[in-house]
Amino acid sequence: MDVIQPCIKIQVHTKYIEEQSNPELQRYVFAYVITIKNLSQQTVQLISRRWLITDSNGKQMTVEGEGVVGQQPFISGSDEYTYSSGTALETPVGVMQGHYILLDEKGNEFITEIDPFRLAIPNVLN
């Protein structure tokens, strides 16, 4: 499996979901919206994902599975795919990172890394 970074660009936006959170019970819920941009001219298919989620206490959780939000989307050349999902932490600050495994038009698998991104309630410095 090859790592081919330049052809895929990942953009992430996060938001704290206060109405689903309960700080007294150490439950902090975050939503994230991810846009996967295919910068190549060929169609790719996202077949699986792997996340490493770390809270500010150092507690880690790994999430792996097929596709994203129940789909294994095809992303045409110069097109993009956007989806939203969420996670809950026991602390008000955390970090997510991971990778997607994709297929090119020839059926070759490749990995696209997802750089670490911060999950934090507003106005937290940690």
Curated annotation (Swiss-Prot):
Organism: Vibrio campbellii (strain ATCC BAA-1116)
SUPFAM superfamilies given in the database record: ApaG-like
Residue ranges of domain ApaG in the record: 2-126
Biological processes per GO annotation: error-free translesion synthesis
Name this polypeptide is given: Protein ApaG
Domain of life: Bacteria
